[in-house]
């Protein structure tokens, strides 16, 4: 509630003004949302000292004395709507900044949009609410200059102390600049915090060239996580929030939903960071802003693969199964995605991808020893019959009518079990016959799939019900020798086919997150630093450099 003593002084100030020429009368009783544009082209600017109420967060300004009010009739303090509009148009035409928020700001004022931040009372607490957030951006590695904080604060000070004149500090020029910069900073901040200041799909899906000729260039898909981006409706809503005096509420609502964001900010708050640490913080905070449709924090049970860590974590409540993993090389990077593990296949056959056939197999066309050594066979797609490797040409191997398949069992490149999930890259999580990879520090060795150190333990984790009989069958199937006996080979233990299992549904499906963070906490909240194995921090920083301190 407004203080009664102060109310009396407001009325006295109004009475003083009321004694002036009718040309300069302002009606104090009207809402501050009645913008300058609704008044005559020249109105007296005096209410910059007044504050509408004393609610929490409002800025209390000194009451005008009779001497001060008398000075307000001077030309220096007159607000002229047409002059403000002209200045706004000049600012919009001179603005060359390229963010979507910037273009929305330009369009809004060039189209004659309502004044949002300034009115006959000057500039109220909404500007202070915005500045309170903008003054914290250095905690996330950003510079205040990106949001024109210095200029906004100087102009607010001029208005609130009447430090204006008829020259370069002309009140209409200052007010127009305040209006424009507040809107631009507001849209930049709210859109960036809510959706991210960068678009990961544009950045990472235009990074690695797949094919290139004189006509076109195609790129590998490296980022396939669905992220929301700001729409026209978002910007319209944001501007409406300013107009309706809901700035503070909206600023709280647009903060990142990812729990990791708050952890990163808290971990580095108040610390003196090296340049490398600052860049790492900047990049990982930005990743945590990208507005995904799903997050690990939404689930009690899930599988997380953080590529730079070279580890897979299977998490259920407070229980964590951790294992080493190997991922794609620099040329065949593991794509980032969210999915659900739906099925596990035991002793799978491997249908070799065309890219691998082209790179590694086609040179051995007509060499049956190579195919036998790798336990490959060739299948005619239309007839379903096997083709003698001795009769296969390079052209046939490259023809989609023929498959090259590796037999399941011991020695298969997929190992003894593969975990299937929907994705656009034909990748999966699997066991491997190349166990040596897990002894390496750098484990970027695959064609894009994820190889795991503890496949049986992961299989058990994924089961909805821990059925002992089923677990025994999976274990037995993963150890049974299913290969054909070779001539002269000693008699081996007979396979018990009743204990074999080929495919097991994961019910319910388990969420899978394949992500990329060079700063990431463990389940206890301790932050860990990882090498930038794919160089994604460097790529992302090129887009964030202009924002940095």
Where are these regions (language model features)?
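Bacterial Sec-dependent N-terminal signal peptides
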Residues: 1-65
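Generic detection of intrinsically disordered/low-complexity segments and helix-coil linkers/edges
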Residues: 4, 18, 47, 102-103, ...
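Well-ordered beta-sheet/strand-loop patches within structured domains
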Residues: 24, 53-102, 108-110, 187, ...
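Cationic-aromatic interfacial patches
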Residues: 54-211
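Short His/Asp/Glu-rich catalytic/ion-coordination signatures at enzyme active sites or charged loops
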Residues: 164-171, 209-239
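Surface-exposed interaction patches
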Residues: 182-206, 215, 221-225, 234, ...
């Amino acid at each position: 509630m407004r203080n009664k003593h102060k109310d009396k002084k407001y009325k006295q100030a109004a009475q003083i003004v009321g004694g002036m020429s009718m040309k300069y009368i302002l009606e104090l009783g009207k809402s501050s949302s009645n913008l300058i544009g609704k008044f005559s082209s020249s109105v007296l600017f005096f209410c910059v000292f007044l504050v509408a109420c004393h609610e929490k967060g409002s800025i209390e300004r000194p009451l005008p004395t009779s001497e001060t009010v008398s000075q307000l009739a001077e030309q220096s303090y007159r607000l002229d709507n047409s002059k403000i509009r002209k200045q706004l148009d000049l600012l919009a035409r001179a603005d060359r900044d390229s963010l979507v928020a910037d273009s929305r700001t330009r369009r809004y004022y060039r189209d004659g949009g309502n004044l949002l931040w300034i009115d006959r009372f000057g500039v109220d607490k909404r500007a202070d609410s915005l500045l309170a957030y903008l003054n914290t951006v250095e905690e996330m590695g950003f510079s205040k200059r990106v949001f024109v904080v210095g200029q906004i604060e100087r102009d607010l000070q001029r208005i609130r102390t009447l430090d204006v004149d008829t020259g370069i500090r002309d009140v209409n020029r200052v007010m127009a600049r305040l209006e424009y910069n507040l809107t631009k900073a507001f849209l930049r901040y709210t859109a960036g915090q809510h959706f991210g200041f960068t678009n990961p799909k544009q950045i990472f899906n235009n990074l690695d060239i797949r094919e290139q000729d004189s006509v076109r260039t195609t790129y590998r898909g490296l980022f396939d996580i669905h992220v929301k981006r700001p729409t026209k409706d978002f910007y319209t809503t944001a501007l409406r929030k300013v107009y309706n005096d809901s700035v503070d509420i909206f600023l709280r609502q647009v903060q990142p939903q990812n729990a990791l964001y708050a952890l990163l900010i808290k971990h580095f708050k108040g610390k003196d960071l090296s340049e490398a640490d600052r860049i790492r913080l900047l990049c990982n905070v930005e990743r945590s802003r990208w507005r995904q449709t799903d997050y690990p924090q939404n689930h009690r049970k899930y599988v997380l693969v953080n590529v730079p860590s070279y580890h897979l974590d299977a998490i259920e409540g407070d229980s964590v199964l951790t294992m080493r993993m190997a991922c794609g090389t620099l040329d065949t990077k593991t794509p980032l995605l969210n999915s659900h593990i739906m099925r596990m296949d035991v002793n799978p056959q491997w249908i070799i991808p065309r890219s691998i056939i082209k790179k590694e197999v086609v040179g051995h066309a007509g060499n049956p020893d190579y195919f036998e050594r790798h336990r490959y066979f060739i299948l005619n797609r239309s007839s379903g019959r096997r083709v003698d490797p001795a009769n296969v040409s390079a052209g046939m191997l490259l023809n989609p009518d023929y498959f090259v398949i590796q037999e399941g069992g011991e020695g298969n490149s997929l190992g003894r079990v593969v975990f299937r999930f929907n994705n656009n890259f034909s990748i999966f999580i699997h066991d491997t016959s190349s166990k040596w990879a897990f002894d390496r520090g750098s484990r970027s060795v695959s064609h894009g799939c994820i190889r795991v150190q503890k496949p049986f333990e992961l299989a058990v984790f994924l089961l909805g019900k821990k059925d002992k009989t089923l677990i025994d069958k999976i274990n037995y199937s993963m150890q049974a020798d299913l290969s054909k006996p070779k001539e002269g080979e000693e008699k081996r233990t007979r396979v018990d086919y009743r204990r074999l299992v080929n495919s097991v549904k994961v019910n319910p499906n388990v969420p899978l997150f394949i992500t990329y963070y060079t700063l990431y906490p463990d389940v206890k909240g301790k932050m860990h630093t990882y090498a930038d194995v794919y160089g994604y921090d460097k790529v992302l920083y090129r887009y964030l450099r202009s924002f940095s301190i």
